[in-house]
Amino acid sequence: MNRRKKYKIFILCCLALDLMTMAWLGYRYLDRQIPDELQISRGETVSVSALLDHPLVSFEEAIEVSADGSYTLPCKILGYIPFKSIKVTPVEDKSVYVSGSTVGIYLRTRGVLVVDTGEIQSQSGETEEPSKGIVKPGDYILSMNEEQIKDKKELIRDLDELDGTQVQLELNREGEILPVSVTPVKDSKGAYKLGLWVRDDTQGIGTLTYVDEQGKYGALGHGISDVDTAGLLDIQEGTLYKAQILAVSRGSRGNPGELAGMIRYDNSNVLGSIQENCKKGIYGQMDLSEAQKLSLVKMPVAHKQEIEIGPALIRCSVDGQVKEYEAQIKRIDLNHEDSNKSFILQVTDEELLEKTGGVVQGMLVGYNKDKRGKTQYLQGLT
């Protein structure tokens, strides 16, 4: 094969690769613009093409939403290339009381969280690591020798009773229950150790997003993860407290900043219980009498396809009082892999920029749906 022919083949391969890359990038772009799921108001005739207007993608003209359940809506590229099916779910219109108040958070893990394994100086002077390769950071110890372990105190108590024989641990590893065996090591002081760093609780402050009429609330807009393992905490229970802002760590490029405050852990400051910790935030039940004392404004909950580029409001407390600050939604992503990254927001309010440097962790974001000053807030997003 002569050089000219090889060169032609090389050029054709490069062109084919370019076309494949362009097609893949185009598919990725459309996939991010068109969501996999939609929620729409029950009993309403909705033009999907109006909700998800895109020149390259076609949908059925309208669907009648009833109480019968969800619909699967096929869509095509250029009218004939199958693209994806959108799950359309009818939901009741809902209003909630949006807040922006600062709250204190205390969580107890379900079992004892393993932060890391560690070395032990044995009585013989040797360095041993009995749990290495058996127990992993992020595991939860649920029981030892068939005795349930609820917290560090129970684990330490049971360790004090060890006699050096092998112990049986029941672990929760990413949702899978695993039985493992570890042989403890007697340290230089004569105590038996497993060589584990553990944690059973965490605390902090954040922003209360909303409360509904039954006292069910959502807060933070992101899950609470362990600072060492970076894993989402599996919680047994938690308590929501009143909190006081003491300082604001200013945000900067690459650093979101944060609100710093004080929590008084006594019954007079309890606002409610924390029942769930997930990627979208923490959820639970609030005492309605306590909720009524907070700064709350009743607002309708919007669907994600109703978000528009343009003016938005950030509702938060950075100096002890809930206020609204101006911002701009710059870009919208209806189908991002991370459900907490639905849009890009730019703070434009000079007062907030002066106080915080921009968005800091723990702020509630809303947007102006009808352009006439009636703000709608996005449930669970901060």
Locate the predicted segments by residue.
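Extracellular Ig-like/FN3 beta-sandwich strand-entry sites
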Residues: D68-T72, G164-Q166, I307-I309
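Conserved PDZ fold ligand-binding element
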Residues: P130-K153, K369-K371, T382
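Beta-strand-enriched, solvent-exposed domains that form extended recognition/catalytic surfaces
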Residues: L25-L78, V88
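Short, Lys/Arg- and Gly-enriched loop/turn segments at beta-strand edges
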Residues: E147-D158, P179, K323-E326, G373
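Hydrophobic membrane-insertion alpha-helices, especially the h-region
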Residues: K8-L25
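PDZ-domain C-terminal substructure recognizer with occasional recognition of PDZ-binding tails
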Residues: I77, I86, P90-D93, I156-G195
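Serine endopeptidase catalytic core focused on the charge-relay Asp
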Residues: V185-L381
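Signal peptide-directed extracytoplasmic domains
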Residues: D93-E128, N172, I177-V185
